[in-house]
Swiss-Prot record:
Organism ancestry: Eukaryota, Fungi, Dikarya, Ascomycota, Saccharomycotina
Organism whose genome encodes this protein: Saccharomyces cerevisiae (strain ATCC 204508 / S288c) (Baker's yeast)
Residues covered by the GAE domain: 466-581
Subunit structure: Binds to ARF1 and ARF2.
PANTHER family associated with the record: ADP-RIBOSYLATION FACTOR-BINDING PROTEIN GGA1-RELATED
Alphabetized GO MF terms: phosphatidylinositol-4-phosphate binding; ubiquitin binding
CDD domains given in the database record: GAT_GGA_fungi (cd14235), VHS_GGA_fungi (cd16998)
Keyword annotations: Coiled coil, Golgi apparatus, Isopeptide bond, Protein transport, Transport, Ubl conjugation
Superkingdom of this protein's organism: Eukaryota
Pfam families for this protein: Alpha_adaptinC2, GAT, VHS
GO-annotated cellular components: cytosol; trans-Golgi network
Gene Ontology process terms (BP): Golgi to endosome transport; Golgi to vacuole transport; protein transport to vacuole involved in ubiquitin-dependent protein catabolic process via the multivesicular body sorting pathway
Every GAT domain range: 196-321
Cell location: Golgi apparatus, trans-Golgi network
Protein name as annotated: ADP-ribosylation factor-binding protein GGA2
Amino acid sequence: MSHPHSHSIYLSELPVRKPQALGNPLLRKIQRACRMSLAEPDLALNLDIADYINEKQGAAPRDAAIALAKLINNRESHVAIFALSLLDVLVKNCGYPFHLQISRKEFLNELVKRFPGHPPLRYSKIQRLILTAIEEWYQTICKHSSYKNDMGYIRDMHRLLKYKGYAFPKISESDLAVLKPSNQLKTASEIQKEQEIAQAAKLEELIRRGKPEDLREANKLMKIMAGFKEDNAVQAKQAISSELNKLKRKADLLNEMLESPDSQNWDNETTQELHSALKVAQPKFQKIIEEEQEDDALVQDLLKFNDTVNQLLEKFNLLKNGDSNAASQIHPSHVSAPLQQSSGALTNEINLIDFNDLDEAPSQGNNNTNGTGTPAAAETSVNDLLGDLTDLSISNPSTANQASFGLGGDIVLGSSQPAPPVTTTNNSNNTLDLLGLSTPQSPTNSQAVNSSGFDLLMGFNPTTGTTTAPARTLVNQSPNLKIEFEISRESNSVIRIKSFFTNLSSSPISNLVFLLAVPKSMSLKLQPQSSNFMIGNAKDGISQEGTIENAPANPSKALKVKWKVNYSVNSTQAEETAVFTLPNV
């Protein structure tokens, strides 16, 4: 007897949808972790799924959250319980990228989809587990995390359920401690890695959502992630400085307590905690010194602080062993003077923002490659292209397969609608847009608009007719993907570009998003892509048309555009980017 899911996958010429669970390794793992045949939750498999999500990133946290929300509403209670168990593991092990997904309005609406408008006399086990989960999130990531502003909808759902009469269980301190942030000293590289992961997840959600204020925020974030501003490094250094100051205050407090006439002062809970904090942090000192060796002031300060910590640890151990005479000969110096801090232009400019209603769309990856020429020339040309990044709009691919997600329950935070199309107007203060993905424009919105600069994937209404026969030009070719442009001139000021994408690998390419940018003196308008998925070895499997306005026919210098493409192949996120010089047309 054949398995009900053991059918082949047929790719028709109908509009392409996202690959089904059968072809997605993550969704297969989730289905296996929630299967009815399990006697109890499979913790090893659940942790394996968490590791998989942390490794893959990209769309993985989002795909997992959507799949789990649906499984939690399964009519089989065993499946729902296993899904909630897996959800708990992912929340506690996958960090901000997954927290961002559970804070979405649609996810929360789907989570409580089976809750009646008024509380039942007795909660079901599923309802109790869901209320417990929301209470845990409310008491931890909504209050104590560094990105708590992004968790607004969790707070709203907690407040709404309470208003409806639902009672939340009391959560033990030990359970809450797992999700509360730990104030451990980290090196700059560790901090920057965490920042990059969080920023990549935030950027995907900003792009997918497509509201003007979010896209402006995405522009700022893209600028930082692309390395045009060094705020990640600045913030990492400030975080180190802040944690060191806290440790120094702890060191001084421990020193005062060990100097106390009370001979048993070393053995109380506070002293033990201070001793533990210093002992755990000390191995990081050497790593920070290695990474920050060019900062002589920081290195010297750390070396001095390390000597003080060694003295304190030795004094603590002597008192613990009853050798108070030897301990009295050790007098560590006072160390809690604040370190000198650096400051950056955008130190406080980028915060993880409060997301409102979100709608479904694919995500991008966050690996970086650069195809520019010499570093100096590339930096000059790219900075000329980029400048400040402002108004843009976004386009969401078809989401028919998620149409009912987050809808239909008695308790909802509000209707979720796709972001409306956004048009940009010329503004002398705006310099350029990096990263605009457009919502398809309605037929009535036919007025031509000029962007102030650099739009990636701006929606537009097709203009009619071309005056020059298009010639195809190779833009880039990698082992997986070939990109070509057909470039023609419509008028003395308008260039038409049609992009073609060919899959050079035998594996399907999915979640492809192409971003394009032009100098700030010009305006870019792009139609939505023909698709975001193509089968292996598909020639011209995806195409996209667009126009560049305010492009003079005989420019004084060659027109350069910056392009970037994100896609998934073999369950791996890929990104390619470069600056391309258009041939004169």
